[in-house]
Amino acid sequence: MEDKEIGTPLPLPHSEARLQPTLVLTTLSAAFGSVFQYGYNIAVINTPHKVFKSFYNDTHFERHGTFMDESTLLLLWSCTVSMFPLGGLLGSLVVGLMVNKWGRKGTLLINNVFAITSAVLMGVSKVARAFELIILSRVLVGICAGIAYSTLPMYLGELAPQNLRGALGTMTEVFVIIGVLLAQIFSLQAILGNATGWPILLALTGVPAVIQLLSLPFFPESPRYTLIEKGDEETARQALRRLRGQNYNVEAEMEEMRTEERTEQAEGRLSVLNLFTFRPLRWQLISIVVLMAGQQLSGINAVNYYADVIYTSAGVDPTQSQYVTLGSGVINLVMTLVSAVIIERLGRRILLLSGYAICCSACLVLTVALLLQSTAPELSYLSIVCVFSYIVGHSIGPSPVPSVVRTEIVLQSSRTAAFTVDGAVHWLTNFIVGLTFPSIQVAIGAYSFLVFAGVCILTAAYIYVVIPETKGRTFVEINCAFAKRNGVEFPEEKEVATAKPHTPSLPTKETAF
């Protein structure tokens, strides 16, 4: 099949790919050994924080004969908490170099060094009587999480067939939440969240890393990376056959990747600095920044931080609030799985917009309930409903969907640079919220949730105006949709509209798509 005007062979129509065992197992191995670490280490120190502080204090007494004053203990604990997102930021800054040199799968495997090292250090910290090992390990496991959170969506997005790209893309957030939930379960006082069990609790972060080291080498590297960046067409074809099944015609997908490769030959590999000045990717880059900043600044971490106070004000016994928190974690996981099921039916935009609408409404009602519950105590129960509603809203859109969209709106040659920016924004905003929210909450109290409602409105407005629906489109077609907004001429746009499911060839030098 050939376009007579351009003389470029066009790819055959895509058939619907079915979910194959190899693709499922690759996803499980890659996700469990990577972003699971992110979720687990976010939550693992929250419930038993008094146990850790006691260890810090006892260690100080053994060394100096006196206990720490409250300000010193608070400073050390703040360092323990904040070192994780700081490590995540460091990891996100090196991920571009790693995935270009060692590939997506290779980067995930090398990344396990950070997880295993931190697990060993945290596991022996009690025997060594050195709380400093915990703080150092939080940096290392943060680096692991930062690398994983940028690499896994890239890997899964490039492994997935077009009709399953959304569902597989949400697995990044699904496994983050599974990590959070298991950490909440294991850190219960009756299990490992106690004075004797906490070293094991922290060291468990090494188990997924070992499992991945033993399993992931047997699964294929990203076919797009193999073909477009390494030029190894036969290995890419073999990988596609393993991922799609032997009865699937992989040639249409191979031709689509060749088309993408041709569009990028004039562009070359973009660095992070070049990305900021590259006109054809201007709105894609802005969209990535808005999606990741909106995800964090919309208040999910603040709601989790404030949840225990809300539960206590509603009459929940402080010793039982850990179980209410566990219940919210279950809701989070269930709704994220629902998002994974419906994303290819409803699309990305509707999940993002409806999710932000729910979050905004929950923040507004929560503000009113918190302000009035001193005069109307029954409103404290409404506060709990608002927390759970917020979690539902964030779980169906703002949490899982950006991982899908950020992979889809950039092409292969710019993806690593874009994900470096993406990861840096994610971890920096995460760090800012964790650092500033306690002070904001003290200063303005319940009104702090109005700030998050405003962020939800602004982010949703941007998505509505700027970000197109990406469901069912190839990577090249999605970038064509951004062309007019970027002020770039695409002579093939008419062909895309009239000749679907053909994928256009884009040889124009200026567009570099």
UniProtKB/Swiss-Prot annotation:
Q: Which SUPFAM superfamilies match?
A: MFS general substrate transporter
- Asked if the record carries the keyword Transmembrane, the reply is yes
The residues that the entry says bind D-glucose are 295-296, 301, 332
InterPro entries of this UniProt entry?
Answer: GLUT, MFS_dom, MFS_sugar_transport-like, MFS_trans_sf, Sugar/inositol_transpt, Sugar_transporter_CS
Q: What is this protein called?
A: Solute carrier family 2, facilitated glucose transporter member 7
- This protein's record includes keyword rRNA-binding: no
NCBIfam families to which the protein is assigned, alphabetical: SP (TIGR00879)
Q: Which residue stretches are annotated as topological domain Extracellular?
A: 43-78, 129-138, 194-198, 304-322, 373-380, 438-446
Cytoplasmic side, ranges: 1-21, 100-107, 160-172, 220-282, 344-351, 402-416, 468-513
Q: Show the Gene3D superfamilies listed in the entry.
A: MFS general substrate transporter like domains
What single Pfam family name could you report for this chain, choosing any that match?
Sugar_tr
Q: Which family does it belong to?
A: Belongs to the major facilitator superfamily. Sugar transporter (TC 2.A.1.1) family. Glucose transporter subfamily.
Q: Which residues are glycosylated?
A: 57
Annotated catalysed reactions: D-glucose(out) = D-glucose(in); D-fructose(out) = D-fructose(in)
The transmembrane residues are 22-42, 79-99, 108-128, 139-159, 173-193, 199-219, 283-303, 323-343, 352-372, 381-401, 417-437, 447-467
Top-level division of the source organism's lineage: Eukaryota
